[in-house]
């Protein structure tokens, strides 16, 4: 892959974000103490924490830092998981689960701390994250989350319907869960800022250098690319959602453990000040409890950055614009005519039980999967934990225990069928207003069964 082959999506983030550091291709034979495959948030965070400990580290990136999921997402900084709550995590992992919950609790604060300490210009706004509930039955989700996260000292609050209306500027929701430490960033600016930071600290990033294979030679791992190779005493594979694109032949057990789900993002024209002040006036990040998720946040230019899902062939962009326009006008009639300046997509890495996983891939070799839509906050402390593992910290002290990869059965078929789950989600969303309790029970039964299958 050469520099001309790196094509960025037509995204808002690619349009407004300054270029990252100049990263050469990997050529010849190189060495480092630690080699990381993947230049997204996790790989960059791992490199950052290793360089803080003066470890010689090099990243091998297939395209450019932030090209994959890290630079394409909505940029919401969410210090929770998508489904499992603290009690679920502790029931699964015991004492390690308590450490993991503490890591999650602090994950958003950790991200904003890194941004401040290294003066990364990521358009960051720590105004909090709110999860409004879309049906009366779903208020139980917010109540449960507030109760469980409060036990661990998280700054969370249960919002009434009136409080939610005041916070979001819409009466479409029935209450909500609010975490004050959340917020949002320009994710590509964060990725490029992290890349610039780690290079400044002495790390090397080899771009446009897809890893073709790795093997154990003596006491070192050797990663081969088209034009060169690099060896290290330790190896970290941090490809996650794009494992199937760039690392399927490298670590098939990881590539088939994570399900890449296509996520569409959209950015409106900048809203006028008068309208902006009536729609999410406090500029919180918002994503609700719909199966077909409703989510939105502002960028630094007052564009409303949202998205949706679309099925089938044909003009997907046109149909998506029409569907999301109708949604925005229904939620916020005051928005008036809606025009989208940018529409793009990228993959989210999903595991069957909605939990992230760390793996040992061999002596001094590590990998992970499963951002499950929470990568922006999660990957910063996760990179720290991978760096600690590389440096020999015992597993009993890590925030996330190691586990064996658990593949999706019939992964290729499921990948084709997964988008059509949207039909089921839409049907449930429409029926929940009448039969909320029934569908709430079904949702958690599904989670329980997925957890049992992945053990």
What spans do the regions from the language model cover?
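Extreme N-terminal leader/targeting segments of oxidoreductases
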Residues: 1-34, 52
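Glycine-rich active-site loop/strand segments that organize a redox cofactor
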Residues: 72-103
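Flavin (FAD/FMN) cofactor-binding and adjacent substrate-gating region
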Residues: 2-16, 83-89, 113-193
